Design a protein with these regions (language model features):
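Conserved active-site and SAM-binding loop architecture
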Residues: 1-195
Length: 195
């Protein structure tokens, strides 16, 4: 996986050397930084050491390439997002500004998914990050009604990925992006469907 990211990156920089970007949004894979992985210790040969090594050997190099891409293209604005509970924050300069947001405050998907968004460059100074205090309208019995996997809470799902459909886990609310960029609300953002 790491090799393909590096090769793809090399191709981008060779073909877009003169391009000017207003915005770069980067969402590096979160699985190697996930704190949920610790629940696998003792299963299928996973150890604390093997999980840490995977993060250092796969996760951190992808994060560094992501940062290198942002540095190379020097966009007017950039965002780097990952789950707030993950360990990626341990590998990002603590002086880089960030927002913490909850997706349930920006969409009707029914799950919280607290997300950290680091940012740089020109920002919307009117942006106010929204965090859920169980006031989003998607809470029953003091819990959000859906898992990030797209399955109702209390129902069985196969792993964190919800089976073969990982799209719910990786989607980003278009309203959040619109607010971050201070864009008017529109359905035509050229983004993947929110549903």
């Amino acid at each position: 996986m790491r090799q393909s990211v590096v090769m793809y990156y090399s191709g981008i920089t060779n073909s877009l050397r003169l391009a000017v970007f207003d915005v770069i949004w980067a969402s590096p894979p979160c699985e190697t930084f996930s704190t949920v992985r610790r629940s696998n210790i003792g299963r299928n040969g996973y150890t604390k050491e093997s999980i840490y090594a995977d993060m250092i050997e796969r996760g951190v190099p992808i994060l560094r390439k992501t940062q290198e891409i942002i540095d190379y293209f020097q966009p007017k604005t950039w965002f780097l997002e990952n789950p707030q509970t993950g360990l990626m924050k341990n590998y990002i300069d603590p002086f880089i500004s960030f927002y913490d947001v909850d997706y349930c405050k920006y969409t009707d998907w029914g799950y919280r998914k607290r997300t950290r968004i680091w940012y740089g460059g020109v920002q919307n100074e009117n942006f106010i990050p929204r965090l859920c205090e169980k006031d989003c309208g998607f809470v029953e019995n003091n819990r959000h009604v859906m898992h990030v996997t797209g399955t109702p809470k209390g129902k069985s799902s196969k792993g964190q990925g919800g089976g073969n459909n990982r799209a719910p886990r990786y989607r980003i609310p278009s309203v959040l992006i619109q607010e971050l960029l201070s864009l008017p609300y529109t359905e035509d953002l050229c983004l993947p469907s929110d549903t």
